[in-house]
Every structure is written in structure tokens, then in C-alpha cells.
Amino acid sequence: MRTIIALETHDVRFPTSRELDGSDAMNPDPDYSAAYVVLRTDGAEDLAGYGLVFTIGRGNDVQTAAVAALAEHVVGLSVDKVIADLGAFARRLTNDSQLRWLGPEKGVMHMAIGAVINAAWDLAARAANKPLWRFIAELTPEQLVDTIDFRYLSDALTRDEALAILRDAQPQRAARTATLIEQGYPAYTTSPGWLGYSDEKLVRLAKEAVADGFRTIKLKVGANVQDDIRRCRLARAAIGPDIAMAVDANQRWDVGPAIDWMRQLAEFDIAWIEEPTSPDDVLGHAAIRQGITPVPVSTGEHTQNRVVFKQLLQAGAVDLIQIDAARVGGVNENLAILLLAAKFGVRVFPHAGGVGLCELVQHLAMADFVAITGKMEDRAIEFVDHLHQHFLDPVRIQHGRYLAPEVPGFSAEMHPASIAEFSYPDGRFWVEDLAASKAKA
């Protein structure tokens, strides 16, 4: 019998703030980081499962400690039993009678639980010798719904409704898989649009994005309206009228200012405004959507669980949503969110602006195409061109599209050398960086 013998964690941080990669109106100096987890087993060929929580620097130690605190809940479990019932494994963590007090199902502990759940899915896909998107897409509708906790959802999506959606898609799975492998999945890029970039860098990267085949770019906005008008004008001139341009305020505004600000940017034919206000403010998003029609409104990367997504959809507060592979309770909760979006007919544009997020969320979007909606040409996965070299199975982008992963698992495994180099504070990079700072002082 194979057994989980250890839960291993690493606080991994990359100095992205040095070049202002990832900078936006609320987060001007992010150091992209990961609370990285490995589920070690005594299975053959060093079988293991990998997962992570994305953070932006300070606090990553807190997030890593939360992941480590889950060791007693998973070490000693049978690998085969975990794989056979990933729904029960997830509920073992999310429904713990004492851990729930730290949420319930939100915040640092919920993200930690999500990382461990994702590592279990990675383990299952590796054991099946399949990339995760294919592993999910080849589960039966009954197996898929068994992974989902429908508590708090039944007023919007029942188990029977979810089964009907999945069963309706089942006859097309083989054809959709072939299409995905042949064509890839559409991507959009945020790489030109970080707020700290110079105008020259913005224009250069926007033109490069179009040349690389991207049909949508996204700019960060929200710090200064005149700067945003200038940057949007430069970007629109660089990409031309036929390329879509979205903007992202990263929760910077109250409701009234969001409406006023977006009315001033409307001339640039905005594809959507992302995170205009607090991710918890369902009614605020609804008011903004009403106030800036026809500009679409989006949120989701900080939406903390399936319940808030349900409310956003029920309230008609959004035109599209972002899912995030590492924000909610793992694959299980993201499957619930994808099915909710399908029920309400709302498009999903997954969030991937962070270390490892492109690698992870591509699997969820592709599984959605094959097993749930059959749609991808009216949506896209975010792409940022940072830090992929640190992963054993990095994303592959060709002509503005994600190519379907072929390597078994969730694409979450990092190179051991990268972990050794960038572990905080004892990795070689950070030791040398601290020494250099002391020398300058």
C-alpha cells in the first residue's frame, strides 16, 4: 500500500520588484512568491504531488506555515484512497471542525488547504500518467460531481443540474480533445501593461504582443486618471483598432470613482474592466456594471470561495469572471465555480498573473472546454512572461495560444535548483542579497 509519508514546504520568493514586473495600482512592488508544497510518498519512482499558493512577498512565511500546519491531516493517508475519492480528501480539510474557525473557507488557511488539495490532484494525475486537464476531462460526470461540495450552492446549482451539464458535454469530449491538441487554447497577455513600466516599454511590448499573435492585451490602471488616459492612448495606437484591450484596477476604487474613471477611458474601446473595487463587494460590482454599460465588468482572482462567485452571478454583477488556481479550495472548488459560470452563461478568463499560475490554471480552462462548456474562442487564459523557467513543465505559448500540456500532472513542480536559489531567507540569492545590502550600508 502506497502512503503519504511527508508534507514538505518551501518559502520561495523571486525579486520581481527590482524590474517592477507585476506592478499595479495597489501592489507597486511585488516580489512574486510561492508557498510551495510537496506530498512525498513511498510509492515507486518517487511518486509525489506538488502544489503552491501564490503571494507577492511579505507574508509568504505565514502562508507557508499555514500549509505546513496541515501535515498531520495528510501524512499517513493511503495514496490509493486519496486518489480514489478526491472529494472526500478535500472535505477532510475544508470541513475540519476546528480549522473551519479560521475561515470558514476563506483566507490564508483556505488557500493553504487549496494548495494541498491541488497537490493531491497532481499526485492522482501523475499516478494515472496523464496531464491534469486530461485526467479531469476523462472522469465520468458522476465522478466529477462527487468531487464537488454543493453545500451553499443548491439555490443556484444543484448536483442534478451539474450532472446534466456534464452529461450533455460527454459525447463531444473526444472531438473537443482533438481540437484542443490541434489548436491550443486562446491566451491574452498582461506582460506589456504593468503600471511601473515606462511608456517606451509599454509601446514596445504591446507591439511585440501583437506580433506574437495575441489578440488581447491588458493594462494596469487606477493610480492617476490622466496617466491612464495617456497610457491607453499609447497602447491603442501601438496595437491598432482590431486588437482587444482590457484594463485592471486591482480593487483601487470605490463605486462612484470607478464609474467616473471608466467613463473617461471608454473612448479606447475597453474589452473589460477587471477588479474595479473590493472583491467582496457584490453589490458594488453590480452598481459599477450598471453605471458603465456597455463596458464589461469582471472580477474573481481575489474572490475567496464558490459562495461569493455564486452571489456575483446571481446578482448580475459581472459580465465575465476570473478563476484562480491557488486562491480557492483547489481543483474541487474551481470545478464548482466553472459549473456555476456555465449555468449562468458567463465567460471565464482565468487569472494567471503570478508565479506558477499560468502553469496551473491552463489545466482548469482546458478541462472546462473539453468536459463542461465546449467553448474557448470567446474567452482566453491570461499569460505573463515571467518565471516559467523555474518549472519542470513550463507553459508553451504559440501564436498567442496555450498548447495543451502533455507531461503527467498539474505542471506545478519546480526545479530543485530554483528552490535552493530562491528559498527565503536562506537561499543563495537572498543570502547574497542581504550581504550586498549590508556592505552598501
From Swiss-Prot:
Binds 1 Mg(2+) ion per subunit. One of its GO terms (biological process) is carbohydrate catabolic process. It is an enzyme of class 4 (lyase). Substrate binds at residues 22-24, 32, 218, 250, 274, 301, 351-353, 382. It catalyses: L-fuconate = 2-dehydro-3-deoxy-L-fuconate + H2O. The active site is at residues 220, 351. Keywords: Lyase, Magnesium, Metal-binding. Its cofactor is Mg(2+). Pfam families: MR_MLE_C (PF13378), MR_MLE_N (PF02746). Gene3D superfamilies: Enolase-like C-terminal domain (3.20.20.120), Enolase-like, N-terminal domain (3.30.390.10). Mg(2+) binds at residues 248, 274, 301. Signal peptide: none annotated. The keyword Lyase applies. GO terms for molecular function: hydro-lyase activity; L-fuconate dehydratase activity; magnesium ion binding. The keyword Metal-binding applies. Its EC number is 4.2.1.68. Belongs to the mandelate racemase/muconate lactonizing enzyme family. Homodimer. Plays a role in the catabolism of L-fucose. Catalyzes the dehydration of L-fuconate to 2-keto-3-deoxy-L-fuconate by the abstraction of the 2-proton to generate an enediolate intermediate that is stabilized by the magnesium ion. L-fuconate is the preferred substrate with 15-fold lower activity observed for L-galactonate and 8-fold lower activity with D-arabinonate. No activity detected with D-fuconate. Can also catalyze the epimerization of L-talonate and D-ribonate, but at slow rates. This is L-fuconate dehydratase. The lineage of its organism: Bacteria, Pseudomonadati, Pseudomonadota, Gammaproteobacteria, Lysobacterales.
